[in-house]
């Protein structure tokens, strides 16, 4: 760990010590460099930074919250500090990071998972916290479950549809909210029976191993709800090995717009796909750039906002996103989204439609 900390410190010196741009931003990416979602998330941020003239640095924590905290400590208490720190409240690390940031001179912005009510009460109002942008995770889980049920053939009165669910981590806000949305949809459809919900840790191999065991116990399952694409593919592999045909014998759902997930929608192997939240970091940079130029974010939708980014992606849109995917910025002109000089009625167009122009 000491070697890792020394390496991070050297990196900070190289990055921020020579910074000549008006604003420097460090993003603490909680994910892995092997995860398609978090890589695409970073790529979209980098595209935004280039267009906006922001000096952006990204550090990955490789799914280790203790590494996120170590990175934050060096950024906030070291000699070369960024102007802004963007981070995720993954595994509820935000209060610790905010304590480190006290009197550091670094401004904070939270993405993807904001402060919980209890955390907000704990840290109170802070002038250094600029704002937050989070997706509609609860609604996303609900929409995905509703779409699966809609696509499933109707059953006779008294018969049931059997479901397996793969959630992420118990201590991840996005996982909890998507799960909550799924349960809300199930309450509206008593004919669907949730056989078991397991935590796949967002990982394909773990979901595969879990699905193999669950299939023996519940051979009549015909719906699989998964909180991300990796777990959906792991479960799909287990069902395929058992002789089940994805999209016919069993309907699968997932979240994330990885190329593999988009292709699975086009091929019919994934029946319901939600995505769009990989853009949150890029949108956050638009707001930070506006803030740097004196824009009052409260006048343009508020500083803490939930954005309805998670939307159902059909075959047409999946193919369109695949065709556009070679360009990580999706052709977005980030500067044109600025609220500077616009009337108070203006709202940032942070949605999938902005990518589908």
Name what the model sees in each region.
Residues 166-170, 283-357:
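Hinge/cleft segment of the Venus flytrap/periplasmic-binding protein
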Residues 108-120, 225-270, 279:
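Venus flytrap/periplasmic-binding-protein-like
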Residues 99-139, 261-262:
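Flexible loop/hinge segments that line or gate small-molecule binding clefts
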Residues 28, 79-89, 107-112, 164-165, ...:
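Periplasmic-binding protein-like
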Residues 24-44, 48, 57-71, 89-92, ...:
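Extracytoplasmic "Venus flytrap"
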Residues 67-83, 92, 208-220:
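Short, well-structured alpha-helical segments in soluble
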